[in-house]
Structures are given as structure tokens and as C-alpha cells.
Amino acid sequence: MKKILLTLIAVITMSASAFAQANSDRITFGMGVLYENSLDATIAWEHETKYHNAWEFFVNGNVKWDECQSCGHICPDSFWKNYRTWGVGAAYKPCVVRGRNHYGNLRIGDSAGSNTDKFLGGIHVGYEHNFALRKGWVLFVQAKCDLLIPDREDLFREGITVGFKIPTIKK
């Protein structure tokens, strides 16, 4: 009886966890540093389809800091009031690398938003590597390149973002 009960528990546990990564939804929080003095933050909702391919709908904010003219350091005015952008967009993320407890996606998307003066359109290309943690949480590292149109001050933004994906309520 004890063997049958242990076998039944093992089968139920394995079958329940076998579909843990399929068709799941996650809330994503990421923050990173981009080339030429920029801090980037993204909040997103991600829907994962078959084979770790995913759709992401995101809100992105970026702050570009500069050294203060009066003190020569980075102060609150030179950080927060220098140059800011925000955007809302979508990205498709096909899976290109799969392994045990990790997978990698290309990230291809676009966005629309604004800086402090005018409209900005963005084209986003990058690579995201995901590491599965416990209870459906995921740690990700993202290398990104953003092309902002028609802005000449901040045309290309390249950098690295690190964040977490938190699972939503299961269906």
C-alpha cells in the first residue's frame, strides 16, 4: 500500500509540473543601464505560447542623466530633469535556445511614446535569456538595442536589463 501511495504521489506531482511553462502569463519587472548614461525600467505583461515563444505588452521609461554644470557631479536635478522618454509597445519573442531550467528568446517589437517635447516611435531588437526559479518565477537578463525615430539625441540605445517574471493566477 505504501509503494502504491508513493507511486501515485510521484505521478501526480510529475504530471502537474510537466505543463508548468505552457501557455502561462507573467508580470515582468526589469531595470537596467543603457549606453550613454541612461537608466531604463520596464513593466510588462507576457503571454507564453507553445515552446517558450511569447508575446509581451510593455510600458517603458528611460532617464538620461548628465553631470551638473555647477557641481560637476550627478545631482537630483541633472538626473531627473535632463532627458526622459516613455513608451508603450508590443514585442514578439521566439525561442531560439532551450535547456534544462533556462531558455533564450529573440525580442522583436515596436513602441510609441514621447520624450519631453515630441512623439517618438521605437523599434526594439534584443536577446533575452531566462532562468526558471521556484514556483514559476523567472529571472531574466536582456541585451537590448532600441532605435528611436525621429529623435537624433537618443537614436540608438544599447544596454543590459535584469529583472523578474512573476506568474499570474493559474487558469
Residue ranges and their predicted role:
Residues A20-W65, K165-K171:
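Short glycine/proline- and aromatic-enriched beta-strand/turn motifs that initiate or cap beta-hairpins
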Residues F29-T42, W80-R84, S111-G121, L148-R157:
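Solvent-exposed loop/turn segments connecting transmembrane beta-strands
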Residues N37, E67-C75, C145-E153:
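Noncatalytic linker/hinge segments flanking ATPase motor cores
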Residues E46-L139, I166:
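Gram-negative (and chloroplast) outer-membrane scaffold detector with strong preference
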Residues V141-A143:
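Internal, hydrophobic beta-strand segments that form the core of beta-sheet-rich folds
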Residues M1-S24, T168-K171:
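Cleavable N-terminal export/targeting peptides
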Residues V88, D154-K171:
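Outer-membrane beta-barrel "beta-signal"
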Residues T28-G30, R107, H124, T161:
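Short glycine/serine/threonine-biased micro-segments
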